[in-house]
Amino acid sequence: VQRVGPSTGMPTRTQQCDIKSCAYASHGDTMHVLLCPADPADCFYMAVQAFDLAERLQTPIMVLSDLDIGMNDWMVPELEWDENYIPDRGKVLNAEELEEMENFYRYLDVDGDGIPYRSLPGVHPKGAYFTRGSGHTT
């Protein structure tokens, strides 16, 4: 929940001051996905959307609400959950696909969309990879 902040003397004033900070919080080589719900119902549905986008794009998704949503009473329509909903896990290789590959390179962009395929832990030994913060393999 965004607000001016406790150190300014205005901790309960509604503001959207973190949007720009979140949008440009990097070295400038990446874009960030920001979701800004307008009411509690949006918070519910955007939370699901945020998880799907994070899995599909393999990047953090920021959901930013303001103090108005966090502190006020709201009347919203009854929230509905689709029992047939299937989470979007993005580009995930299964055991058969990994078996067919000669080598699996975690960060190789094979189809040019900027999003590499990934494997889930324990699916296949070829899907294992070591990663660290200082670089990638091809």
Give residue ranges: language-model regions.
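Generic structural hydrophobic/aromatic packing signal, biased to beta-strands
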Residues: 1, 22, 35, 61-63
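Flexible glycine/proline-rich, aromatic-decorated loop/lid segments
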Residues: 1-29, 81-82
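Hydrophobic alpha-helical scaffolding
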Residues: 5-12, 33-40, 94, 106, ...
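Flexible, low-complexity linker and terminal segments
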Residues: 46-138
